[in-house]
């Protein structure tokens, strides 16, 4: 299986950020499903002019024939050769209609998610894991009798984000934790396949008398707005993607009854962990009590991207010529990022579906070194079986922060990127297609650290 998720899911997806949608069965001859099938057939035939025939203006601008061809070249390395289209279904998302066509590749089955606007033009496209709808199965350590959940909204008028506050029952005040997503248009639960790691953490910690705030990511709720507005698209960086909303979440908790305002913590996972130093800096006047870095990347994103591609194409034990091309393409994209100049900051071009300013903003950013400026306690957590953010990153955090008396480190031998247990070579199957939960001992360690601080 050669599916890339997590750190780079947002960089390899064309089009609209997904949101919670209402699913319904569609008749076989549904017009939009037929359009989606024709689009996929054109892709498979490498007829990219035909593929973009139904693109709306925004998609044509950001993902025209050349960029679509560039994307399609990466697909065999991720999924194997395309075999056939299978079943299809429909979703409705506000003004959009979504056709999902199951596609069988040589090494994995994926759903092609083709988004149509009210004029039946294609407004977005992405591949997502093909999974049957799964009911959330809470981990055994979560006790719903101990807490309640409240719907909240964070952010300004232009960027309001719905979320959930999971708060223990009782008078309080309770310590609280804000959860900050990894990359990609994540929902509040960081849902991937049948799994919801952020919900595991929220329910698990609330069972230990710790309140948890989680929210929809900005790129999930406002994906179309970010794409269509040129000013926003060109200037969009990790500040807008993650940092600002994490700080707003802390402010909301400070104004919430039942919360111990002197004991509000922030946890960042994956990209969120990488950005903890920036969140700490942006919220330095808020008195945040401490920070937790879960599988936080320390290396440049483009370097980790090449490593991920190389790992994924090697999972079957052989490197084919197509695999080599995939690795070479990844290296070429990485080199494009490294070759960017400050003069490119206002350009509308995209590299790995992110603007030059996005990449330039991260140039020279060393999260581990930046973390030295954090005066509050820091806890770094890492799974040894994580191929996306590796023990190399963990050692970088450790090397930089080890002299600090208020820094703590935990390395878990059996855990993957989502802090689920597994054995052998880690693959995306472990969390994209197999039900799992954040390990209970991780919840216990986080709870103990928060209560200690």
Question: Which residue ranges define each predicted feature?
Answer:
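Short solvent-exposed beta->alpha transition segments
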Residues: 33-34, 49-94
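N-terminal cap/lid segment of alpha/beta-hydrolase-fold proteins
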Residues: 132-172
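Primarily recognizes the serine-hydrolase "nucleophile elbow" in alpha/beta-hydrolase
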Residues: 248-312
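Accessory cap/linker subdomain of secreted extracellular hydrolases
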Residues: 285-373
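Short beta-strand/loop motif that positions the catalytic acidic residue
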Residues: 374, 380-382
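Catalytic active-site module of serine/aspartate enzymes centered on a nucleophile-bearing elbow/loop
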Residues: 418, 424-453
């Amino acid at each position: 299986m050669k599916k890339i998720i997590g750190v780079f899911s947002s960089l390899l997806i064309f089009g609209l950020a997904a949101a919670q949608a209402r699913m319904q069965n569609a008749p076989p001859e549904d017009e939009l499903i037929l359009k989606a099938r024709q689009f996929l057939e054109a892709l498979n035939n490498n007829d990219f002019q035909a593929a973009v025939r139904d693109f709306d203006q925004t998609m044509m601008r950001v993902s025209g024939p050349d960029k679509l061809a560039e994307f399609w070249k990466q697909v065999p390395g991720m999924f194997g050769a395309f075999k056939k289209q299978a079943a299809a279904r429909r979703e409705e998302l506000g003004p959009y209609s979504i056709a999902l066509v199951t596609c069988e590749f040589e090494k994995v089955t994926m759903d092609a998610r083709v988004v149509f606007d009210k004029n039946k033009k294609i407004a977005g496209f992405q591949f997502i894991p093909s999974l049957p709808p799964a009911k959330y199965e809470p981990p055994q350590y979560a006790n719903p009798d101990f807490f309640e959940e409240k719907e909240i909204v964070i952010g300004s008028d232009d960027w309001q984000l719905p979320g959930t506050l999971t708060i223990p029952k009782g008078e309080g005040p309770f310590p609280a934790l804000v959860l900050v997503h990894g990359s990609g248009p994540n929902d509040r639960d960081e849902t991937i396949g049948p799994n919801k790691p952020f919900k595991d953490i929220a329910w698990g910690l609330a069972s230990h008398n710790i309140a948890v705030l989680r929210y929809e990511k900005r790129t999930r709720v406002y994906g179309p707005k970010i794409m269509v507005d040129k000013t926003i698209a060109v200037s969009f960086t990790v500040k807008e993607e993650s940092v600002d909303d994490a700080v707003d979440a802390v402010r909301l908790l400070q104004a919430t009854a039942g919360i111990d305002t002197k004991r509000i913590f922030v946890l960042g996972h994956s990209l969120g962990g990488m950005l903890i130093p920036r969140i700490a800096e942006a919220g330095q006047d808020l008195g945040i009590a401490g920070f937790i870095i879960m599988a936080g990347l320390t290396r440049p994103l483009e370097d980790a991207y090449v490593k991920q591609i190389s790992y994924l194409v090697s999972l079957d034990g052989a490197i084919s010529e197509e695999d080599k091309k995939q690795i070479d393409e990844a290296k070429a994209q990485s080199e494009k990022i490294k070759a960017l100049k400050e003069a490119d900051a206002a350009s509308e071009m995209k590299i790995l579906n992110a603007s030059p300013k996005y990449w330039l903003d991260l140039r020279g950013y060393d999260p581990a070194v930046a973390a030295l400026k954090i005066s509050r306690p820091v806890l770094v957590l890492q799974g040894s079986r994580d191929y996306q953010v590796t023990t190399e990153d963990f050692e970088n955090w450790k090397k930089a922060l080890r002299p600090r008396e208020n820094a703590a480190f935990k390395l878990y031998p059996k855990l993957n990127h989502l802090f689920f247990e597994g054995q052998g070579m880690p693959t995306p199957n472990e969390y994209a297609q197999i039900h799992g939960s954040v390990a209970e001992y991780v919840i216990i360690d986080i709870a103990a650290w928060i209560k200690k601080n």
